Swiss-Prot record:
The active site is at Y208 (proton acceptor). GO terms for molecular function: estradiol 17-beta-dehydrogenase [NAD(P)+] activity; oxidoreductase activity; very-long-chain 3-oxoacyl-CoA reductase activity. This is Very-long-chain 3-oxoacyl-CoA reductase-A. It is a multi-pass membrane protein. It is an enzyme of class 1 (oxidoreductase). Substrate binds at S195. NADP(+) binds at residues 56-85. It is found in: Endoplasmic reticulum membrane. GO terms for biological process: estrogen biosynthetic process; fatty acid biosynthetic process. Its EC number is 1.1.1.330, 1.1.1.62.
Amino acid sequence: MESFNVVETLQPAERALFWVGALITASLALYVVYKTITGFRIWVLGNGDLLSPKLGKWAVVTGATDGIGKSYAEELARRGFSMMLISRSQEKLDDVAKSLESTYKVETKTIAVDFSQIDVYPKIEKGLAGLEIGILVNNVGISYSYPEFFLHIPDLENFITTMINVNITSVCQMTRLVLPRMEARAKGVILNISSASGMFPVPLLTIYSSTKAFVDFFSRGLQTEYKCKGIIIQSVLPFFVATKMTKIRKPTLDKPTPERYVAAELNTVGLQDQTNGYFPHAVMGWVTTILAPIDLVLNLGLRMNKAQRGGYLRRRKLR
């Protein structure tokens, strides 16, 4: 009995379509398998002991006294790094430094500066002199007090300057100070904390969103420049984390504590040049940038932020 071959019964045009469909199906299947394996490596296996003082004795964290920055300092100290903490309040810096020394038995140093001022970098450069820096976490950043239309932002001229100095200039200048010695030793890690707000425009948070898009592009460009020299530069784009800045008090699965977020994010270093840092955030990033049309994302953002703006102004009777 002769075997029946479906392909041979098709007309030439139908046969071509059949093979195109088969090729597309096979490609999609391979893509799913690849992404599954890659995801397992990133979110389950992690990067092992990549982040250790073998990179360099010291880790530097800006904005190190609260939220995500403080959690980076704690986690890196737990891994054995001596910590250089840079933030505005010397009192808060001293409190965090004492806690790290007591809990993790590591050496600490502090530099108190206001990153909204552009004349602070000679002081920072002097404080960093002679340190073997393995990791730099560019975390310091500011956002809006509440969502607002561009022309209605109080003290707009100063707001623009301050936002750029803290969110953009600090990243560039700190990288300028630290990267040369990393390049000379052919190893080092720079983590630039951007935001999911930098993945797409966010109406009523437009300046903040734009500064975070800069941080993302800056990080990815530098990684391409310096990856071949043994240096890792990663763009980190978290969604909401339960911190003072976000005003989220109760953590949830999609709004984790900073400790939980940082522990997850550090496992992605060396595996992703651009990361949302935390699996639920990675899913949210895929939905907002790949699945959902950008116009829908923009309109939803506008509606949500207008509602938050209205609530803020009503509470303060400013509307």
